[in-house]
Amino acid sequence: MFPELNNLLSTTPDKTEQGTLTLLCDAKTDGSFLVHHFLSFYLKANCKVCFVALVQSFSHYNIVGQKLGVSLTAARDRGQLVFLEGLKSSVEVLFHSQDEPHPLQFLREAGTGNLQSLYTFIQDTLKPADSEESPWKYPVLLVDNLSVLLSLGVGAVAVLDFMQYCRATVCCELKGNVVALVHDTEGATDEGNDTLLNGLSHQSHLILRAEGLATGFCKDVHGQLSILWRRPSRSTAQRAQSLTYQYKIQDKNVSFFAKGMSPAVL
């Protein structure tokens, strides 16, 4: 995890909110550093994590995780992390016969966009057994990233329904958290992605939007991050609070600073 980002969000692994949906989105830049932050953050917070990884392999996330001080292999072995590797699983679904329903069964059912099997997998993974006391604080669902589902032929409405069920189960019933990344196809005519992004924005308690610089590439400033808190339970004046910072990604950290305040230009 990145300590400076924790400071901006006023949170630590020992002090976290429960029952929240966090939306990560990136526009004209790579926002995967946010996924790595929240993955390592919740593992360090001793949460049970179900990670639906549709973009990269387990080894990729594990290598980055080690740089951030967590071992995904160890977390998986002790049952804290359940990792659904989309790249590997999709090959199994498409080219091998399955005796039982697979979380990515919708790949075989072209045109249906039915994510029921994926939701059932998440539900079974995160729901504690009735007779057991969970050693973990609370459950967390992390998805990287939802835009991939659209590219695989699932409709935006089906993805929104899926996320609504996940939020009802994880956030409301189990008092856990959901974190999901969505690409923002800014300027492109992609109605499905816009529908998904707008729908999730209205449901989210926290939105982190990473975007490239309008002026183009800069060696010392890699992009800017907008943070929007949405607190429905607060008074009207406190419901929405927004901050924007610029950032630079380093090998094992990300540094944040106010616009135009990069150490390289001061």
Curated annotation (Swiss-Prot):
GO biological-process terms attached to the record? apoptotic process; autophagosome maturation; autophagy; cellular response to stress; homeostasis of number of retina cells; inflammasome-mediated signaling pathway; locomotory behavior; motor behavior
- Signal peptide range equals none
Task: Respond yes or no to whether keyword Nucleus is given for this record.
Answer: yes
One Pfam family, short name please? ELP6
- Localization in the cell: Cytoplasm; Nucleus
- Is tRNA processing among this UniProt entry's keywords? yes
Q: Which family does it belong to?
A: Belongs to the ELP6 family.
Q: What is this protein called?
A: Elongator complex protein 6
Give the organism, scientific name. Mus musculus (Mouse)
Instruction: Name the gene.
Output: Elp6
